[in-house]
């Protein structure tokens, strides 16, 4: 189906060998030109979803295939593919092949550098908690990029802002009938740190942030039962001295 809607050098299906040659012919300049054109097609107010997927491989010839955090748990080395998609347009605006041993949180710096080179302004990024780190938050603030990023509840910054509202969080006024969960927004301050090598100093200031807390009582109950089942399984293994 793809070959009927896209222009390429071959008449019908692209043979495997030809596809390898075609992909190998795409230069960094070609990619950047594509990213710039796609950036101009974006919808002004849509947000961009940034995520990474892993592709397992048996190849011993591809240098980027490395042992890392394999998401499929198939005990194979992998190559990572970082992608940015428009939420409304469903268009891919950016992609980058990465070595399989690079953690998600270490890729945001490269993404921001690429967006600066491409000259794409007013980006709104949405990311999962794998990208959360102090370095990334500071980098997003530095480049004046609006963002929404998930975070683990166990993090000190997240937990310290939850503690004052914890007792009243599950009260009636914070329940959303539409989404069937409890939600509350907390305004807080982020300690922004920027190192300036040229001036030989470090800038520290407070940035306003909003934290969105959600609680799904059904999921919490399921998680608690799953934890209890895991404890029972471990108990049986200890008592029988065999893996269950």
What kind of feature is each model-predicted range?
Residues 1-244:
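Anion-binding and metal-coordination hotspots
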